[in-house]
Amino acid sequence: METNGSTKLLGRYIVADPKICHGQLTFRGTRIFVEDVLEQVASGMAWETIIEEWHNSITKEAITEAVQLATKALLNHTDEFVLEPEPV
């Protein structure tokens, strides 16, 4: 992760800037929360539809980066998660 002043660059498309959306992860140049897009991906929404819903403010490459970073974070922190079995 690189920093540019107080802005954290997590990749080519994803940033955390305290001056934008209180430092939440957003797509560079937008106020679109990475979390919102990842929730849309998780719900099964087609990526093309997600892009259209955000008026083409994000790209397929940006969504790919978000999914890759989320995957990496999960794999790096797996031991911190404790899942309770679902009741049958």
Name each model-derived stretch.
Residues K8-T49:
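A short, structured beta-strand/loop element
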Residues M1-E2:
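Long, low-complexity intrinsically disordered regulatory regions enriched in P/S/T/G and acidic residues
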